[in-house]
Amino acid sequence: MNYPHPIIAREGWPFIAIAAVIALLIHAVGGFGFAWPFWLLLVFVVQFFRDPQRPIPAQPNAVLCPADGRIVAVETAQDPYANREALKISVFMNVFNVHSQRSPVDGAISKVEYFPGAFLNAAIDKASTENERNAVVIQTASGKTVTSVQIAGLIARRILCYVRAGEPLSRGQRYGFIRFGSRVDVYLPLGSRAKVSIGEKVYASSTILAELEQ
């Protein structure tokens, strides 16, 4: 699948431009000795908004990771967006991870729902239910329900979602972005087999989170 997005996310272009102008102005006035922290900030902002293409596994029953980060939960939990018991897998993104979100499965969106909330540390469990979040509920062609939830964090305070109910999604398709550290929860049907463990480093689209029961 082609990834029709620039390697530096458009969401970051204004921040990069501002950081570059500040660094250039301070360098022009005070030289590199004064400007180096601002050049360093520019490098950080550029790396934060990187958005590389990733290989997408072809395995038909695979649930792909929706974001880069580290696994912080693999457990049975209530999926409040689809009213069911589910297998929940949570990915925590720190400020050094890629922050775009990509669809874990092929399917059609049955619901997109936004919830205002707090901005707790996204690595802790109660962030799933108390923080600002946006849920995308996807129905696969085989009738399976997969819920992907963008969750704001302590630093991240802007969730961007570019899809609506009724639209199709393809596995690996970019559908959202969260700025500056956050979390994504994925809820799967009971009977799905987790393929990751807590503490594991994962990558959007290329890591298989789980396998749906066939």
Swiss-Prot record:
Cross-referenced HAMAP family: PS_decarb_PSD_A
Role description: Catalyzes the formation of phosphatidylethanolamine (PtdEtn) from phosphatidylserine (PtdSer).
Annotated site location: Cleavage (non-hydrolytic): 181-182
Family note: Belongs to the phosphatidylserine decarboxylase family. PSD-A subfamily.
Self-association state and partner proteins as the record states: Heterodimer of a large membrane-associated beta subunit and a small pyruvoyl-containing alpha subunit.
Record-given protein name: Phosphatidylserine decarboxylase proenzyme
Entry keyword Transmembrane helix: no
